[in-house]
């Protein structure tokens, strides 16, 4: 549906025929049989020829590119989940754009048979903002990582959230720099020893959900790479949200930070150490659903349910994703193992006018008031001079 790799250094969308990718005026190999996606940033990705009209499938969203993540990487599970969800959204592939920055996660657009931009470090939200503002009918997805999105890209990340463009931002959090081989990232734990911190990290880590909520994101959620059913449901909910959606995915880097989340994501302990948030339901967890969360003054606490304590589900805090005040969502985002179960699910889902709708309204108002502008007339008006 657009470029696959080398040759397009200008970020230009390439035209695709029935059987191959072609481009006018650009050099380099841009055919489907070209090099693997070790391309320069700024390129746009290409996939297969469009299928005949009809119901799309997961295969229709899989490009012809070899997936080049490390064997066992959590990114495979995320890719699989998103490709499964795409057909159910009912959006034509030519109306979908994936935008990435730099990092392992940023190879993502190459593997989606949609339009895509592989941009520069940390700038995916800025490029996505331009795409959505210029073409509001598109479904725009940003794929980033904890390094790309929260370090050099932190400023763009924050402003994309507060503006509330109708973007879907998926952040792969593995608490490490993977592509550059194991340096600490903004989400690495305090004291963690890495190649760039041999004596331990002395930075305090960013909590991505806290940052997203503080930046006024209207949809905030979290899932786990290996919990495919849950992840797929979260991605689908994010896609249906009108406004910016932010999804953090706990993703295992089995080469440079293996087991970063296994203390609570491993299947045998997950029921006791993960709290699955569900709108309108009490916050209950545990293999036997015998523990819950309630408020004790201004703080949450874990309570034991059952006849011994006389407490039951009615004593637990009931989750409400639609509360406009972000205080409870922020509190939940701060809950962490081992004191609390690790919350996953939708933390916040509220409605607010989107940036692109407000922008379109302003443009319509301006045109109605002063008429449609004439660029040629503007350039040739007023004092002018010629440099010879």
Predicted region positions:
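Glycine-rich ThDP/TPP pyrophosphate-binding loop and its adjacent helix/strand module
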Residues: 152-153, 159-167, 172, 176-314, ...
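Thiamine diphosphate
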Residues: 100-178
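Active-site diphosphate/adenylate-binding microenvironment
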Residues: 59-120
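Long, contiguous secondary-structure blocks with strong helical propensity
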Residues: 2, 23-30, 48, 82-99, ...
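General structural feature for long, well-ordered alpha-helical segments within catalytic domains
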Residues: 66-69, 74-81, 94, 153-156, ...
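Flexible, low-complexity linker and terminal segments
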Residues: 2-55, 64, 255-388
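Short coil/turn connectors at secondary-structure junctions
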Residues: 65, 92-96, 134-140, 162-168, ...
């Amino acid at each position: 549906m657009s470029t696959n790799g080398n040759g397009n250094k200008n970020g230009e969308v390439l035209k695709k025929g029935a059987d191959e990718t072609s481009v006018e005026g650009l050099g380099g190999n841009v055919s489907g049989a070209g090099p693997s996606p070790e391309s320069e940033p700024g390129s746009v990705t290409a996939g297969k020829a469009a299928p005949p009209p009809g119901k799309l499938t997961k295969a229709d969203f899989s490009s012809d590119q070899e997936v080049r993540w490390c064997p066992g990487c959590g990114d495979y599970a995320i890719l699989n989940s998103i490709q499964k969800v795409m057909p159910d959204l009912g959006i034509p592939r030519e109306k979908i754009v994936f935008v990435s920055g730099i990092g392992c996660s940023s190879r993502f657009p190459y593997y989606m048979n949609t339009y895509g931009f592989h941009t520069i470090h940390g700038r995916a939200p800025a490029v996505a903002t331009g795409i959505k503002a210029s073409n509001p009918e598109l479904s725009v997805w940003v794929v980033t990582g904890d390094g790309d999105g929260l370090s050099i890209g932190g400023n763009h990340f924050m402003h994309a959230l507060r503006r509330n463009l109708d973007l879907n931002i998926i952040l792969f959090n593995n608490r490490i720099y993977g592509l550059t081989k194991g340096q600490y990232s903004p989400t690495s734990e305090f004291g963690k020893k890495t190649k760039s911190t041999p004596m331990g990290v002395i930075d305090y880590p960013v909590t991505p959900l806290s940052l997203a909520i503080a930046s006024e994101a209207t949809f905030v959620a979290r899932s786990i790479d290996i919990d495919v059913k849950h992840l797929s449901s979260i991605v689908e909910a994010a896609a249906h949200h009108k406004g910016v959606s932010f999804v953090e995915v706990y993703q295992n880097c089995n080469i440079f930070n293996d087991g970063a989340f296994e203390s609570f994501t491993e299947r045998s302990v997950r029921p006791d150490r993960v709290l699955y948030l569900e709108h309108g339901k009490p916050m209950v967890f545990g293999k036997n659903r015998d523990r819950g969360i309630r408020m004790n003054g201004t703080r949450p606490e874990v309570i034991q349910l059952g006849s011994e304590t006389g407490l039951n589900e009615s004593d637990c805090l009931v989750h409400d994703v639609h509360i406009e005040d972000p205080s409870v969502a922020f509190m939940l985002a701060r809950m962490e193992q081992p004191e609390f179960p690790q919350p996953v699910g939708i933390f916040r889902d509220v409605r607010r006018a989107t940036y692109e709708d407000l922008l379109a309204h302003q443009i319509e108002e301006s045109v109605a008031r002063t008429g449609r502008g004439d660029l040629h007339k503007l350039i040739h008006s007023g004092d002018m001079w010629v440099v010879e």
